From Swiss-Prot:
Molecular function per GO: D-serine ammonia-lyase activity; hydro-lyase activity; pyridoxal phosphate binding
Keywords: Lyase, Pyridoxal phosphate
EC number(s) stated in the UniProt entry for this protein: 4.3.1.18
Modified residues (N6-(pyridoxal phosphate)lysine): K118
UniProt cofactor(s): pyridoxal 5'-phosphate
Family assignment from sequence similarity: Belongs to the serine/threonine dehydratase family. DsdA subfamily.
The name this protein goes by in its record: Probable D-serine dehydratase
GO biological process, any: isoleucine biosynthetic process
Catalysed reaction equations from the record: D-serine = pyruvate + NH4(+)
Organism: Aeromonas salmonicida (strain A449)
Length: 443
């Protein structure tokens, strides 16, 4: 990694001074381009997403058997989209600027199995690995009924292998629960930010939890090292995994189908804005990629980060990507948004997606808590703090007339817009933990 000359960096990029001061910032990305220009840099395309979608369909009968809570959705993990008009009215007043389009919430917070967006990528990567092992051993072919995997024979087969991952919490939950269900020995390396209840839940599923006093980067590094020592151990690399990324990307076509069913139009006259909380970047990056493939240049994605962990904004803004961490600037990477407590962004995601992302913004922990309290009060929806990071996004856009003009969004177009806030987690937060969150809100 480079030695960072902070003075030189702030001279070149004045915005970095605001990041160091922990001020909430909004930055619209001048590199943002069309899908045609940006797509080649990703190194993946629609056929890769179709392949991921087909794999999830093959596993759907197995999922119904292994997780009865998925039977209602026929073994496919998907979350609902709901309108939140009371919250919209409250925030129009709170922020003193009016968002005129339609405000919707994507409830990945309530996905089955692990209650977060990470159920998409984490579970998909475990299923992909299991399928490859079983096919290679001659125990499975793609035409089979995958319910056969839900058997003692396969549990014993997968029991010869292990899976490891480093996580701040939610990814570990998804990978841990899925791997243990299949029969793998699974170890989750948890950073200091990880919540106790998440560790407890994993241990209840027979997952080995290794705890660290350091942050996410250390947990990942230790997990990687341990996996290297065991030829039968597969390490799921949140920082660089294209498989995880593709697991998230399937969300794009799913949203398109949901919008069709809801009668929501997306085109040049009816733009779609999507606000995604960002940690290391794999989840929001994969979802944004899928949305771009589904809606093309009519969808505009913004990433949201805590003021104490603005790793992706920092990496893309300076062009240094994973060659810089927030700690290099003296930012502490300590935030209540445990899922977003990442100091160094994924270099793969930053470089792949920097031309397909319209903007980035940061918000304080207290703002996340306040929004958490307001959403619970106004819409009776309870989320964890990090899931609220996307909520101020529409107002950041509404407040920036210059960017609207530059991008050709007039008042009439914005009134026809749809704003989709991606709620990334919180559906499985224990009641006593949720009470603490709500008590921290100043509303």
């Amino acid at each position: 990694m480079k030695n960072i000359d902070v003075q030189q960096l702030t001279n070149q990029f004045p915005l970095v001074q605001s990041l160091i001061a922990l001020e909430p910032v909004t930055w619209f990305n001048p590199k943002a381009s069309t899908l045609a220009v940006g797509l080649p840099y990703v190194g993946l395309d629609g056929s890769d997403v179709a392949d991921a979608s087909a794999r999830l369909a093959r596993f759907a009968p197995y999922m119904c058997e292994a997780f009865p809570e998925t039977r209602a959705s026929k073994g496919i993990l998907e979350s609902e989209i709901v309108a939140i008009p009371a919250m919209q009215a409250t925030l129009n007043t709170r922020y003193g600027v009016e968002v005129t389009g339609k405000l919707l919430l994507k409830k990945d917070s309530h996905l089955p199995i692990s209650g977060s967006i990470k159920a998409r990528g984490g579970i998909y990567e475990v299923l992909t690995h299991a399928e490859q092992l079983a096919i290679k051993a001659g125990l499975l072919c793609e035409e089979d009924d995958y319910r056969k995997l839900f058997s003692e024979e396969f549990r014993q087969f997968f029991g010869q292998y292990s899976i490891a991952v480093g996580s701040t919490g939610n990814l570990g939950m998804s990978i841990g629960i899925m791997s243990a269900k299949l029969g793998f020995t699974v170890t989750v390396h948890m950073s200091a930010d990880a919540r106790e209840w998440k560790k407890r839940k994993l241990r209840e599923h027979g997952v080995i939890v290794v705890e660290y006093a350091e942050d996410y980067g250390v947990a990942v590094e230790q997990g990687r090292k341990e996996a290297e020592r065991d030829p039968n151990c597969f390490f799921i690399d949140d920082e660089n995994s294209r498989t995880l990324f593709l697991g998230y990307s399937v969300a794009g076509e799913r949203v398109k189908t949901q919008f069709d069913q809801m009668g929501i139009k997306v085109d040049a006259e009816h733009p779609l804005f999507v606000y995604l909380p960002c940690g290391v970047g794999g989840g929001p990056g994969g979802v944004a990629f899928g949305l771009k493939l589904a809606f093309g240049d009519n969808v505009h994605c913004l990433f949201a980060e805590p003021t104490h962990s603005p790793c992706m904004l920092l990496g893309v803004h300076t062009g240094l990507h994973d060659q810089i961490s927030v700690q290099d600037l003296g930012i502490d990477n300590l935030t209540a948004a445990d899922g977003l407590a990442v100091g160094r962004a994924s270099g793969f995601v930053g470089r792949a997606m920097e031309r397909l992302l319209d903007g980035f913004y940061t918000l304080s922990d207290q703002e996340m808590y306040d929004l958490l309290g307001l959403l619970a009060r106004d819409e009776q929806i309870k989320l964890e703090p990090s899931a609220l990071a996307g909520m101020p996004g529409p107002w950041r856009i509404a407040a920036d007339r210059e960017w609207q003009t530059e991008r050709g969004f007039d008042a009439a177009t914005l009134a026809r817009a749809t704003h989709l806030v991606w709620a990334t987690g919180g559906g499985m937060v224990p009641a006593e933990e949720m009470e603490k969150y709500l008590a921290t809100a100043e509303i």
